[in-house]
Amino acid sequence: MALKQYNPVTPGMRNLVLVDRSDLYKGKPVKKLTEGLVKTGGRNNHGRVTSWWRGGGNKRRYRLIDFKRTKVDVAGRVERLEYDPNRTAFIALITYEDGEQTYILAPQRLQVGDAVISADRADIKPGNAMPLKNMPVGTIIHNVEMKPGKGGQLARSAGCYAQLIGKDAGYAQLRLSSGELRLVRGECLATVGAVSNPDNQNEKLGKAGRSRWMGRRPHVRGVVMNPVDHPHGGGEGRTSGGRHPVTPWGKPTKGKRTRSNKKTDSLIMRSRHLAKKKR
């Protein structure tokens, strides 16, 4: 979908660039495929802020997305494409031959009326899901499982995709958008195609209020806080923080690698931090 630019009839519209969503369905979602969504304001069950700069925003209903694609060997048809306020990608409403309906992530080039299926072997068409071991090398995929049956976890944001670059000893070799090369079990499911809405990264909100509508609050720097709030806080006048950049809890930030899952290190063939390690 194209980008929309606006005439600067107000200051907030001067730099406004939005994705044109005129082709999407304009009604409400299927009620049985949604559930209520309670706002947390970034607080956990103790009431403490664990995710800063969140709160407010328009009321939403959560759309239940089928990341597992467990409806095997039953053909479905794309009923409509919809906007989902809970994610950057668009979603597609699928109606199966037996009458059941589900939402899936909409890949690029998926059109209303297209047929999709989840099967052990299927055509290499956007929206079809199958195990990685049965896909040809070079296929562009998204919504990739990391454990068989767990549901897709990799390449789910707008415009994202992974590429199958090889198969060996029961594992599939994937190249991710980050540059990482990793192994995934061949039995894991993936969906053909790249995720929809690739122009999401080119959007410009134009004004702070549009960010607030999305539930994002102002991102305050640590150096302008008080010492009680942040290690960089305090000082008379403007200061630089006086130490290497750290998080509010004193851990190094700006590039410090924190990965500690040694069990799966053997599945990462090339780290996405390769250039950083050479420094």
Swiss-Prot record:
It comes from the Bacteria. GO terms for cellular component: large ribosomal subunit. Residues 270-279 have a biased composition (Basic residues). Gene3D superfamilies: 2.30.30.30, Nucleic acid-binding proteins (2.40.50.140), Ribosomal protein L2, domain 3 (4.10.950.10). Residues 223-279 are annotated as: Disordered. PROSITE patterns: RIBOSOMAL_L2 (PS00467). Keywords: Ribonucleoprotein, Ribosomal protein, RNA-binding, rRNA-binding. GO terms for molecular function: rRNA binding; structural constituent of ribosome; transferase activity. The keyword Ribonucleoprotein applies. InterPro entries: NA-bd_OB-fold, Rib_uL2_dom2, Ribosomal_uL2, Ribosomal_uL2_bac/org-type, Ribosomal_uL2_C, Ribosomal_uL2_CS, Ribosomal_uL2_dom3, Ribosomal_uL2_RNA-bd_dom. Disulfide bonds: none annotated. Pfam families: Ribosomal_L2, Ribosomal_L2_C. The keyword Ribonucleoprotein applies. One of its GO terms (biological process) is cytoplasmic translation. One of the primary rRNA binding proteins. Required for association of the 30S and 50S subunits to form the 70S ribosome, for tRNA binding and peptide bond formation. It has been suggested to have peptidyltransferase activity; this is somewhat controversial. Makes several contacts with the 16S rRNA in the 70S ribosome. Part of the 50S ribosomal subunit. Forms a bridge to the 30S subunit in the 70S ribosome. Belongs to the universal ribosomal protein uL2 family. PANTHER family: LARGE RIBOSOMAL SUBUNIT PROTEIN UL2M (PTHR13691:SF5), RIBOSOMAL PROTEIN L2 (PTHR13691). This is Large ribosomal subunit protein uL2. It comes from Rhodospirillum rubrum (strain ATCC 11170 / ATH 1.1.1 / DSM 467 / LMG 4362 / NCIMB 8255 / S1).
